[in-house]
């Protein structure tokens, strides 16, 4: 199995290259998608300012109250069905799911989270409707047919929860024993000193994620890639806007994180 994570930065810029390349892998892939850019756009149209939390270590996450959750579910559902329809037009009968469908992805609501405020002080705040994944029904996701999964989970209490798309992709890959996980973003990989870092061990990825050299969403990607690599998954962070992006990633493009460097 190959897990392909399509980031929101790709979805909101140009998804065509990914959609054109995916049919080649329809019999062996699971697709997980993001879409934070559309969530932000819809929130602003509704007069709601998107809110984000900075955690110790510099990782940033979306604060999801009930109103934000409603918009999040709406945006992810739209992206999910558009992606399924685009694949259908190319001869792929994909099935679009959220993690809540059939309890495919179960999560525990984070009631409290530790954050760093604008003054650099650590404090505990309400966790909102954000979940930590506790179980994934990988049998339900096994291809064929190709499953397209949105990052919405369900709690034991029946609550819909926002789960991080990268975290979901890593969990699916690790729990399913996938050989490879391709993370498609709008950058060529981890870039340091103006150059793409071609290969990292899990230890190197984790060390860089905790350093000041790496910022933004790449911190979370490297931390989760390190954990997935320790569990036997080769992770590739590559450019989803490139020609044949999945082919390119599996052929050596981007940054590869693996125990077998």
From Swiss-Prot:
Pfam families: AA_kinase (PF00696). GO terms for biological process: arginine biosynthetic process via ornithine; L-arginine biosynthetic process; lysine biosynthetic process via aminoadipic acid. This is Putative [LysW]-aminoadipate/[LysW]-glutamate kinase. Belongs to the acetylglutamate kinase family. LysZ subfamily. NCBIfam families: argB, PRK14058.1-4. Substrate binds at residues 35-36, 62, 162. The record marks 5, 221 as: Transition state stabilizer. It catalyses: [amino-group carrier protein]-C-terminal-N-(1,4-dicarboxybutan-1-yl)-L-glutamine + ATP = [amino-group carrier protein]-C-terminal-N-(1-carboxy-5-phosphooxy-5-oxopentan-1-yl)-L-glutamine + ADP; [amino-group carrier protein]-C-terminal-gamma-(L-glutamyl)-L-glutamate + ATP = [amino-group carrier protein]-C-terminal-gamma-(5-phospho-L-glutamyl)-L-glutamate + ADP. PANTHER family: N-ACETYLGLUTAMATE SYNTHASE, N-ACETYLGLUTAMATE SYNTHASE, MITOCHONDRIAL. It comes from Pyrobaculum calidifontis (strain DSM 21063 / JCM 11548 / VA1). The keyword ATP-binding applies. GO terms for molecular function: acetylglutamate kinase activity; ATP binding; N2-acetyl-L-aminoadipate kinase activity.
